[in-house]
Curated annotation (Swiss-Prot):
The keyword Oxidoreductase does not apply. It is found in: Cytoplasm. The gene is tsaD. This is tRNA N6-adenosine threonylcarbamoyltransferase. Disulfide bonds: none annotated. Fe cation binds at residues 115, 119, 309. NCBIfam families: gcp_kae1, T6A_TsaD_YgjD. Substrate binds at residues 137-141, 170, 183, 281. The keyword Repeat does not apply. Its cofactor is Fe(2+).
Length: 352
């Protein structure tokens, strides 16, 4: 089985072809990604209209390249999948419309994929992990701990009550005068700084419910920065290091609470999976490795290029759904908000 996946929910335009081999293993045949960082850098963040226009300009070319790299023709595909949300509605419509047109033209099944579900299932493509497992989803727009029990079967254990982790990184970077995107810049500066200089709060620490709250931490960084007259590079590095240390401690504490709740509500946990762009942060990956080793839990960290948005994860989620006979019709609309919960109506779309 071979599926084309299209991703346009934010500021990456992506197309990929993934193959399901005999025995159930997935194989990435092509994975084309075009970032829009340069287009948005001057604004310090993603501008929805610019993002949508950029998707329109490059998507057809990326799809053609993905098919060429995979050495496959459109007619040889078994299905065409596209991220239908959550995300910026203009961009989602671009990818969704393109996928529907290709599916109609080639008489292939169309699969509407939840972008968050695609992140959740990536570890099954890279590592073949069995259900159930604990997902830590950390990106610019989402921070959640989710019990992944099956395709379309998710239990959200905890989430952020305000800022997502990636959003906090970007906002701290902006207030400290660092370049966009902020996550890699904060990590780069943190490597040079003293993580103990500033005693920033660890929000929600010790609470039984594994929710996150980062607005207070973000405010603490702003206050500390404002108290320093003309911060030097050393000051900025120390602020970044102290902020990142607080984030790491918070994520470990919240993950511990999430694992405890998983075992109470679901049972044995086969692994902890990290997904989303923030999962590429080296300090976070090292801390989670230690946490899982101490907890006797297998940790799955997909390659950094599969943590950020990509078409391969959409194609794989399409394969997972198509394997169960779940396809969608051409009336499926973009869903800028689309929760990843087992009791949400949107989690059970598709018809067998």
């Amino acid at each position: 089985m071979r599926v084309l996946g299209i991703e346009t929910t934010c500021d990456e335009t992506a197309a990929a072809v993934v193959q399901l081999n005999p025995g159930g293993a997935g194989e990435i045949l092509s994975n084309e990604v075009m970032s829009q960082i340069a287009e948005h850098a001057a604004y310090g963040g993603v501008v929805p209209e610019i993002a949508a226009r950029a998707h329109i300009e490059v998507l057809d070319r990326l799809v053609a390249r993905a098919l060429e790299d995979a050495k496959i023709k459109l007619a040889e595909l078994d299905g065409i999948a596209a991220a239908a949300g959550p995300g910026l509605v203009g961009g989602v419509i671009v990818g969704l419309t393109t996928a529907k047109a290709l599916a109609l033209a080639s008489h292939k099944p169309f699969i509407a994929v939840n972008h968050l579900e695609a992140h959740a299932l990536t570890a099954r493509l890279t590592d073949g992990v069995d259900f159930p497992y604990l997902l830590l989803l950390v990106s610019g727009g989402h921070t959640q701990l989710v019990a992944v029990k099956g395709v379309g079967d998710y239990l959200r254990l905890g989430s952020t009550v305000d800022d997502a982790v990636g959003e906090a990184f970007d906002k701290v970077a902006k207030m400290l005068g660092l370049a966009y995107p902020g996550g890699p810049e904060v990590e780069r500066m943190a490597a040079k700084g003293d993580p103990t200089r500033f005693d920033f709060p660890r929000p929600m620490q010790g609470r039984a419910k594994p929710d996150f709250s980062l607005s207070g931490l973000k405010t603490a960084v702003r206050v500390a920065a404002q108290r320093i007259h003309s911060p030097s590079q050393t000051d900025v590095a120390d602020l970044c290091a102290s902020f990142q240390a607080a984030i790491v401690d918070t994520m470990i504490d919240r993950s511990r609470a999430g694992l405890r709740l998983f075992r109470e509500r679901v049972g044995d946990c086969n692994a902890m999976v990290v997904a989303g762009g923030v999962g590429a942060n080296g300090a976070i990956r090292r801390a989670l490795s230690r946490f899982c080793a101490e907890s006797g839990l297998r940790l799955i960290l997909p390659p950094p290029q599969l943590c950020t948005d990509n078409g391969a994860m959409i194609a794989w989620a399409g394969i997972e759904r198509l394997s169960l006979g779940l396809v969608d019709d051409m009336t499926f609309a973009a869903r800028p908000r689309w929760p990843l919960d087992s009791n949400a109506e949107a989690a059970h779309h598709g018809k067998a």
